Amino acid sequence: MKVVEISHPMVKHKLGLMRAASISTQEFRRLTKEITSLLTYEVTAGFELEKTEILGWQGENIEIDQIKGKKLTVVPILRAGLGMMDGVFEHVPAAKVSMVGMYRDEKTAKPVAYFAKLCDKLDERVALIVDPMLATGGSMIATVSLLKKAGSKDIKIITLVSAPEGIDTLAKAHPDVELYTASIDSHLNDKKYIIPGLGDAGDKIFGTK
C-alpha cells in the first residue's frame, strides 16, 4: 500500500495547533479544512493531464491542459469526515459526494454500515475517502470494502493523523489503496485512542461531547 506522510511545514504547523487542549471548535474546524486542502493538493499532484482545444479570449482556438480521465467523488465517513469536505472542494468544486456511516457492533466488535449513499459510475471515478483519524483501521477497511463492492477501482484516502497499527491493518486488507496523511503518530493507547493524536475529532468539529 502506498503511504504518504506529508512533510510540508505548513501542514505540520497547522496540525501542531490542532493538538492543543484549549483549541476552540471554530479553530479546529478551520484548521481541518486548511490541512485537508493542502493534502488534496498532494493527492491530485499525480493526476494525468491531456491537451484539449477551446476558444480563447482573443477569438481563436487555443490548446490547454486539463485533467485526464476519471472524475472524483469525495467519500466522507460520518460524521467527522464531513468537516473535511470543504477542503477538498477548494480544489475540486465539482466533485460528487458519496457518504458512508459506520457503527461498531457490540457483539462482534466489527464495523457495520448503517448508511451508504454512493454516487453513480463509481468504476469511472477516483474515490477519495476523508476521515480525520485512522486508528484501528476497522471503519476504513469496511468503507473501502463497501466501495469496492459497489464498483470502485481507484481509491485514495486522506486522514489528518494515522496510527501505525491502523496503517498495517489497512495495508493487509487493501494493499491497492493509497493513504495520504498529515502525520503518522506514535501508537494507540489501551482505549484505542491515537497518541499524541487530536482527541475526538468529531466532537471538536461539531462542538459536542
UniProtKB/Swiss-Prot annotation:
Cofactor: how and how many bound: Binds 1 Mg(2+) ion per subunit. The magnesium is bound as Mg-PRPP.
Q: CDD domains from the entry?
A: PRTases_typeI
Please tell me where uracil binds in this chain.
194, 199-201
Its Gene Ontology biological processes? UMP salvage; uracil salvage
Q: Does the keyword Repressor apply?
A: no
Q: Which reaction does it catalyse?
A: UMP + diphosphate = 5-phospho-alpha-D-ribose 1-diphosphate + uracil
Q: Which GO terms describe its molecular function?
A: GTP binding; magnesium ion binding; uracil phosphoribosyltransferase activity
As recorded in UniProt, its EC number(s) are 2.4.2.9
- Pfam families on file: UPRTase
Pathway given for this chain reads: Pyrimidine metabolism; UMP biosynthesis via salvage pathway; UMP from uracil: step 1/1
- Please list the cofactors this protein needs: Mg(2+)
Positions that bind 5-phospho-alpha-D-ribose 1-diphosphate: 79, 104, 131-139, 200
Regulation of its function: Allosterically activated by GTP.
Query: Under which main EC class is this enzyme filed?
Result: transferase
Key words of the record: Allosteric enzyme, Glycosyltransferase, GTP-binding, Magnesium, Nucleotide-binding, Transferase
Job description of the protein: Catalyzes the conversion of uracil and 5-phospho-alpha-D-ribose 1-diphosphate (PRPP) to UMP and diphosphate.
NCBIfam families documented for this protein? PRK00129.1, upp
Family membership noted in the UniProt record: Belongs to the UPRTase family.
Its protein name is Uracil phosphoribosyltransferase
